Amino acid sequence: MKKIITLGLLLTAFLGNAQAFTGKGDDKFQVGANFQENATGIMATYDHGIGENMSIGIYTTYLLGVDGDGSDFADEFDLKARFNANIGNVIGLPENIDVYPGLNLGLRNFGAHLGGRYFFTNGFGVFTELAVPIAKYESHVFGYEHLNNQFTFSLGASFNL
């Protein structure tokens, strides 16, 4: 029983110290899995705080599991610039949780995303993110052009740098 109480107190201390977004100068790196129709892959983001509740960054994806044959590197790779509104503290969430809606501009489209981060410690947490295209550069996409140009779901690990 003594060990359980000690472990609980240690976890509480770590959770109380963790901060999901601290504002200007805050740097986050995320890596995880990306899921979309007919493909799965790996993704990574880097976000840099430019204000109390704003960050800018980059997002990249490479699809590893594409259904069917015939896709090439250009179909499977994507790169985006992104802007986030980090609103966890605005809506009254604990400091180790952040919610961030945002906009992104990529190689295939202009889109929006909604994500959330939960930090267990000051340096490590988990995240999940949904993204949708708002305006596609090609009005009629088909076949492999649909990859990285549709609704996506990502989840993985988040790190404070």
Label each region the model flagged.
Residues 1-25:
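Bacterial Sec-dependent N-terminal signal peptides
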Residues 16-56, 160:
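Short glycine/proline- and aromatic-enriched beta-strand/turn motifs that initiate or cap beta-hairpins
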Residues 19-26, 52-53, 88-99, 122-123:
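Short loop/turn motifs that connect adjacent beta-strands in outer-membrane beta-barrel proteins
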Residues 20-29, 58-77, 97, 136-147:
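Flexible, solvent-exposed loop segments that connect beta-strands
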Residues 29-33, 58-60, 81-83, 101-103, ...:
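Membrane-embedded beta-strand positions of outer-membrane beta-barrel proteins
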Residues 31-43, 66-75, 102-113, 141-150:
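Solvent-exposed loop/turn segments connecting transmembrane beta-strands
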Residues 33-37, 60-66, 85-89, 105-109, ...:
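Transmembrane beta-strands of outer-membrane beta-barrel pores
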Residues 79-85, 148-161:
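Outer-membrane beta-barrel "beta-signal"
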